[in-house]
Amino acid sequence: MTSLSRPRVEFISTILQTVLNLGLLCLGLILVVFLGKETVHLADVLFAPEQASKYELVEGLVVYFLYFEFIALIVKYFQSGFHFPLRYFVYIGITAIVRLIIVDHKSPLDVLIYSAAILLLVVTLWLCNSKRLKRE
């Protein structure tokens, strides 16, 4: 098997990075559209007189924050030199589990397990932000 020359490897890397960047840019634009749709949906739910609409409003707010966090993750990717910071994924995980607790809270054992998962993610976030793992 022949080894690839350094310029060829850099060219392939550049092509793949460009494809990744374009894909993330498209994903970011799609998320902005969904964020706009969620804003309109939240406005509709806000003025609905039903009692059930309050739960739908809270769920919609958490989904709104999920869209917002994914968009912030993509922005941070471009700002940090094409690198995804781990803590943003942890934030998204915590928000997603909180949404799950709000939507599906019928089983107390499930809520306890979800809460333990949130605690684990918070500890992970604390460890990632500690000085031992801090990247300069």
Swiss-Prot record:
Membrane-spanning segments: 15-35, 55-75, 82-102, 108-128
Domain of life: Bacteria
Any one GO CC term of the record: plasma membrane
Segments on the Cytoplasmic side according to the record's topology features: 1-14, 76-81, 129-136
Keywords of the record: Cell inner membrane, Cell membrane, Membrane, Transmembrane, Transmembrane helix
Entry membrane topology: Multi-pass membrane protein
Ribonucleoprotein in keyword set: no
Tagged with keyword Transmembrane: yes
Subcellular location: Cell inner membrane
Record topological domains on the Periplasmic side: 36-54, 103-107
UniProt-listed GO biological process terms: cellular response to phosphate starvation
InterPro entries recorded: P_starv_induced_PsiE, P_starv_induced_PsiE-like
Family (UniProt): Belongs to the PsiE family.
PANTHER family assigned to the protein according to its UniProt record, in alphabetical order: PROTEIN PSIE
Protein name: Protein PsiE
